[in-house]
């Protein structure tokens, strides 16, 4: 698979500029994915710059391995979530870094070619694990949570206003048969909401899928942890760039950057994609980049 053909890294130029890349620097890409940002950093810090790339999705690692092979020992790959930055850097023998980037969005590989239930456009098992070594799946949540727990999850993690009728419909439907695939879940959600309340700009199941993915992968907890811990490893004057894709994440980044005494906020408002990038890559429309500097 040619990773470069199926994925376009968002806000690439803006991120590279904010990182203030230096030849020979050591940088962390906390979400390697298909290697777009990783390779850009390596290209711009040649010949001696290094990247420690964190990635917990084995499929993404396999898809990007050939593309990144030419960088040889300049690239250190860590199969961990970015929340484990301390363990990963210690294993790599690195104590301090010159910059850190995380891009929290799903890759095209996961949305378009995956088989783990991230997309409601495909009929896959309700899995949603980024790291298939994990035990909890979306199907497990759907099958075991109470109606109240499901409603709270959809409201808190998906900001879904129809959380309660959706939760009630799921509990009723699972009494008849297990809900184990994406299409099953989509049908239940669509029927639970009167058509006049179906959102016009997004799919009716978008927020439910978002909530389940966040819960399965403890995404918000991981995001909070990396912001809390990053100051220990970033050198003074180095930059921390975070690209998020929905308001839940962005609010956490905004608040924690401002509250953390290790950081000075560089972007008071999130940086968004320009018209040219929007025309080239429609998935960039939701991208929000915030940057802080280690003091």
Curated annotation (Swiss-Prot):
UniProt GO cellular component terms: cytoplasm
One Gene Ontology molecular-function label: rRNA (cytosine-N4-)-methyltransferase activity
EC number assigned by the record: 2.1.1.199
Enzyme class: transferase
Binding locations of S-adenosyl-L-methionine: 35-37, 55, 82, 103, 110
Compartments (UniProt record): Cytoplasm
Pfam families reported for this sequence: Methyltransf_5
One annotated GO biological process: rRNA base methylation
Catalytic activity: cytidine(1402) in 16S rRNA + S-adenosyl-L-methionine = N(4)-methylcytidine(1402) in 16S rRNA + S-adenosyl-L-homocysteine + H(+)
Record carries keyword ATP-binding: no
Function of the protein: Specifically methylates the N4 position of cytidine in position 1402 (C1402) of 16S rRNA.
UniProt protein name: Ribosomal RNA small subunit methyltransferase H
Family note: Belongs to the methyltransferase superfamily. RsmH family.
